[in-house]
Amino acid sequence: MAAVSVFQAPVGGFSFDNCRRNAVLEADFAKKGFKLPKARKTGTTIAGVVYKDGIVLGADTRATEGMVVADKNCSKIHFISPNIYCCGAGTAADTDMTTQLISSNLELHSLTTGRLPRVVTANRMLKQMLFRYQGYIGAALVLGGVDVTGPHLYSIYPHGSTDKLPYVTMGSGSLAAMAVFEDKFRPDMEEEEAKKLVSEAIAAGIFNDLGSGSNIDLCVISKSKLDFLRPYSVPNKKGTRFGRYRCEKGTTAVLTEKVTPLELEVLEEIVQTMDTS
């Protein structure tokens, strides 16, 4: 492979060889009655913001399976370490298992060093793992925490790239949430301001994206405390039933009634006795 790369002149631009390969495979599968698998559609709104004393993370609670709401109240804010939490978007199994694995590795790191892990350490572990799998692990993450160097907030993409920003959003409802952040964010906010801002951002994702919905969960991390607010608010409250919606028997008049007996022929009858001894 190295010899080929040495003797071949580099060619600029994009390579569309895989596109032609996929077209040939699709045509071949179509002849045999098969279809190529489609990409999994996922839906979530997760967000985080840095305030004066720490981090506020937020997420909705709807889990979808295609166009079906599979779970109305699932938790998308995952424990990494006592001072670090992580919101997950994408494939639910991938986000769960990825955060559990990194949490376990960070616990071993903490036991070895004798101190709480830094947020940058968790970020490095996550990005290296996701890059190793080249995007096949469908986990888009918002990592936040507070360590000896202060509050830190990262967005981690499924292919392993990361950003460190004062406010981040990810998921299918991220555009609506980002619009709220860009309009109302300001540096050095108080805790209540930050909680309200993240709640409004998640609510924007819930009301503008079908893949997001149900409740709003928040996680507030500072040097002095950790608050896991589940739920922080319920923007989609179920309506109250004020009465019975079934008609009483006899409400609808029966004009005619016809009963047709079924004539069945018993071909075989098997009787099994139950052992009562």
From Swiss-Prot:
Q: What are its E.C. numbers? A: 3.4.25.1
For this entry, list what GO says about its biological process: proteasome-mediated ubiquitin-dependent protein catabolic process
An example GO CC term for this entry is: proteasome core complex, beta-subunit complex
Which residues does the Swiss-Prot or TrEMBL record annotate as the active site? 44
What is the top-level taxon of the source organism?
Eukaryota
Q: Which residues does the record annotate as propeptide? A: 1-43
Q: Where in the cell is it found?
A: Cytoplasm; Nucleus
Cysteines joined through disulfide linkages? none
UniProt KW keywords = Cytoplasm, Hydrolase, Nucleus, Protease, Proteasome, Threonine protease, Zymogen
Q: What CDD domains does the database record attribute to this sequence? A: proteasome_beta_type_7
Query: Which GO molecular function annotations are given, in alphabetical order?
Result: endopeptidase activity; threonine-type endopeptidase activity
Task: Summarize the protein's role.
Answer: Component of the 20S core proteasome complex involved in the proteolytic degradation of most intracellular proteins. This complex plays numerous essential roles within the cell by associating with different regulatory particles. Associated with two 19S regulatory particles, forms the 26S proteasome and thus participates in the ATP-dependent degradation of ubiquitinated proteins.
Q: How does it assemble?
A: The 26S proteasome consists of a 20S proteasome core and two 19S regulatory subunits. The 20S proteasome core is a barrel-shaped complex made of 28 subunits that are arranged in four stacked rings. The two outer rings are each formed by seven alpha subunits, and the two inner rings are formed by seven beta subunits. The proteolytic activity is exerted by three beta-subunits PSMB5, PSMB6 and PSMB7.
> Belongs to which family?
Belongs to the peptidase T1B family.
- This chain's protein is named Proteasome subunit beta type-7
Q: Read off the lineage from the record.
A: Eukaryota, Metazoa, Chordata, Craniata, Vertebrata
Provide the gene name from the record. Psmb7
